[in-house]
Amino acid sequence: MKRHHALLAMLSLAALPCAAQTLKLYDNFDHKPINTSKWAYAFCFSSNGLEMECVREIRDEQLHLTHRHFGVRANDGGQQNGSAGVGFANAQNIKAIRTDVTVRTNFEVACAANPNFGSNTGLWGTFFNPGSGNPTDDVGAALNLKRVASDPPGQLQVIGQTFQAGIYSPFTSLGWVAIGTPVTIGLAWDQPNHQFIISLTNKVTHVTTSATMPYTFSDTTPAAGPAKVMQAGGFTSDCAANATSLYVDAVYDNVYIGQ
């Protein structure tokens, strides 16, 4: 039913760096329900348990993810994490992911005194361990369509980060897109060059932007807690002055992987 989409995706793969050229179609969500042989788990999560809407379903031949959660009305010093998502089966074998995604709605009730949190919709994964064998030390990377309250109205920034043991690298930005813009995002582990490759294609302008995120860790040990995830959600600010919340609605399609 989506052969034309698959063809376009394969043509676009030819322009990717070598680390991501062997991608193959993983799921195009043509059939309900969510395929448990491809998606090992799904989640609705809020770190404080304060959530309302949560959707994880195939609708109109796309994976539909929606989540709304709330901050704590206590002080101005923290945040609450929440999201809806799905985890790839056989995550330890996946080295690259490419998917279409559209953030259709991104609405935040923010906190003026604690404004630096917001949405994160996209991909993340753990790829290797630096040698300790402890899963909390696994090295990973993320690529998200992100928004905080101070960003330009209606805009999402597409950013990548690496992380290890709870420490995150500075953002690597691929630019901005308007909410509602269909895009294709890619995240790949380029082990021979000790870096991650991130990419963004705006499906309206057909402009592709890519960047590398190098690291200095030893990368010969497999991840102790391998995971690859697609999600929609983010962080709400704790706030003394007002109730805060974050609502994100997104659709994913045409997921490709490299092994």
Question: Where do the model's predicted regions map?
Answer:
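Short, tryptophan-glycine- and acidic/Ser/Thr-enriched carbohydrate-recognition patches
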Residues: N28-E53
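Ligand-recognition surfaces built from glycine- and aromatic
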Residues: N28, V72, I94-A96, Y215-Q259
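Secretory/extracellular carbohydrate-interaction modules
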Residues: H64-Q157
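Bacterial N-terminal signal peptides that target proteins for export
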Residues: M1-L8
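Boundary of Sec targeting at the N-terminus
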Residues: A20-Q21
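N-terminal signal peptide c-region/cleavage motif recognized by signal peptidases
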Residues: A15-P17
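Short, aromatic/His-centered strand-loop micro-motif at the edge of beta-sheets
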Residues: I159-G186
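Short tryptophan-centered beta-strand motifs in secreted/extracellular beta-sheet-rich domains
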Residues: F29, T181-W189, F196-I198
